Each structure stands twice: as structure tokens, then as C-alpha cells.
Amino acid sequence: SGFCCAISWNKAIRYPCKSELYSKRVETYLWFEKHAPLDFDLYGVGWENPPAKSGMIGRVISKLYNFFPMRSGVFRRCYKGKIVSKTDVLGDYKFAICYENYKGLKGYITEKIFDCMFSGCIPIYWGAENVLDYIPSECFIDRRNFKDEQSLYDFLKSMDAITFNTYQEKIAAFLDSQSAKKFYIENYVDKVSSVILER
């Protein structure tokens, strides 16, 4: 099994803003590519090309890569290609980078962190300002607690088996709780159905 991975598209936001995490995601990938390539694998679409840039020029450049693909992108050592199943890939790793597209938004928690937890992989999360209102701190590694990628990496590498297993036990307990069930797809379907029936 692998150490750490990430699954994402190589894309950027249309207009730069201070709360976006697309660029932070790329910074983390680049750090691993340079400093710890053997401990990180990157999956997804488009990473054979350089990281996407925001704005009109960035979109034009990205479209050009569709016609003139790069023979080797920035992530030559870490990029492992496209995937068929997130669950199968994540299940082969101890940790996964799962940054939301934006930080600081309350309640903005997408499937990224849950994909990791359901796969038995410990998420390294950055996103919702109030994530701890929904998910216990013992269930994920909060990227906000580290000043840079080096300190995050040192923490991951120093984690012993007991601590790792404790994370997994806490994740399993959380996923089996009522607190987690509000994020299940069945709950969304029930809510949508109830709204439709009320009309």
C-alpha cells in the first residue's frame, strides 16, 4: 500500500480570490513532487500538463493543451494517471490530500473527506471554517494546524501504528453515528423528496 495520495482535476477557478484552495492544492502537490516523490501519488485528469491558471488566459492555455498535449508535465514523478474508482485507489493509501475548492465557508463540506473515510484512508482536510461542528477532530488531519507542507509531512511520517489505528477507529465510529448520516446520499434524497411532496 502507498503512503499519501490525491485525486483531483487539473483546473483553476475562473477569477482569483483569497478563499480559493485550488492553488494551495497545487502547492502541496508540487512540494511532494520536489521533496518526497516516493511518498506521494497524484491521480486525476489533466496533470500530464502544467497546473492550470485562473482567468481568461489560463482557460485558453488549458484548451490549447487539448490539441497540443505536453509529453511530460510538472508532476513527472508523482502523477499516476486517471482512475476508474476513487474508493479502490484511496483504499490503498494511509493518507489523502482532500482540500475543498474554497476555505472559510461555513458548512461547505463536500464528498472529498467522506470518500477518504469510507475507504479507510485518513483525510488531510482543508475547507469549511466550522468543520469541527460536523466532524470530530479525531477523524481527520486538519491542514490548518500546520505552518507548511514540511511540518505536515513530518507529522505524517512520525505517526505510529497506534495513533493511525486510533484515527481509523474514530472514523469508523463517526461513520456509524447519526452525526454522519446527515451527509449520506439517502438523506439528501429524502430531503429533496419531502420538498417536492410539499409543493
Language-model segments: residues:
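Nucleotide-sugar donor-binding catalytic core of glycosyltransferases
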Residues: 1-141, 163, 177-199
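Two-component system phosphotransfer/interaction surface
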Residues: 149-160, 189-193
